[in-house]
C-alpha cells in the first residue's frame, strides 16, 4: 500500500463528486493529502483560505485526510509532502485526454510519482464546481450537489457579490 497520496484540485467549491473521491481514496491509502491549488489563473470565487476551510469541514470525519493549500508545481508539492501517488478523478471520456497529458508531464518531472485515476459514482459524474457555481448564481438549489456547509457558504458569497 502506498502510504501517502495527494488529491489535488482547485475545489472552488468542493462538490459531492470531490467528496466521494476523497472518501474512496481514504480507503485506499494510509494518508491522503487534499492539495488545494491557489491557481489564480482560474479566478476562484472563494479565497484559498476559504477553500481550505470548506474542504476541512466536509472531510472532518476522515481521520487519515489532511487539507493543505499550495502554490507552484504539483510535483514539488508532492515531494514536500513525501507523497508517491497522485489521485485524479475522471468524470467522462472528455477528461481523459487532459488527465493523460498531465500524468505524463508529472511522470517526466517526477518519475517516482504515480497517477491513479478514480471515476465518480454515477450520481456525481456530471457535477463540476463550475456548474454548481452557475446554478447557484442563477438562484438554483445546489443542495443535492454539495455539502450543506458549502451550499450555505456559496449562497453567502453570491449574496455579498450582488450587494
From Swiss-Prot:
Major place of residence: cytoplasm
Residue(s) at site: Transition state stabilizer: 18
Gene3D superfamilies referenced in this protein's UniProt entry, alphabetically: HUPs
Gene Ontology, cellular component aspect: cytoplasm
Cofactor: Mg(2+)
Compartment(s) where it occurs, according to its Swiss-Prot or TrEMBL record: Cytoplasm
Protein name per the record: Phosphopantetheine adenylyltransferase
Pathway: Cofactor biosynthesis; coenzyme A biosynthesis; CoA from (R)-pantothenate: step 4/5
InterPro entries in the record: Cyt_trans-like, PPAT, Rossmann-like_a/b/a_fold
Keywords for this protein: ATP-binding, Coenzyme A biosynthesis, Cytoplasm, Magnesium, Nucleotide-binding, Nucleotidyltransferase, Transferase
Enzyme Commission identifier(s): 2.7.7.3
Record-listed ATP binding positions: 10-11, 18, 89-91, 99, 124-130
Similarity annotation: Belongs to the bacterial CoaD family.
Pfam families documented for this protein: CTP_transf_like
GO terms, molecular function: ATP binding; pantetheine-phosphate adenylyltransferase activity
Reactions catalysed, as given in the entry: (R)-4'-phosphopantetheine + ATP + H(+) = 3'-dephospho-CoA + diphosphate
Sequence positions that bind substrate: 10, 42, 74, 88
Record carries keyword rRNA processing: no
GO biological processes: coenzyme A biosynthetic process
Function as written in the Swiss-Prot or TrEMBL entry: Reversibly transfers an adenylyl group from ATP to 4'-phosphopantetheine, yielding dephospho-CoA (dPCoA) and pyrophosphate.
Catalytic EC class: transferase
Subunit structure, interactors included: Homohexamer.
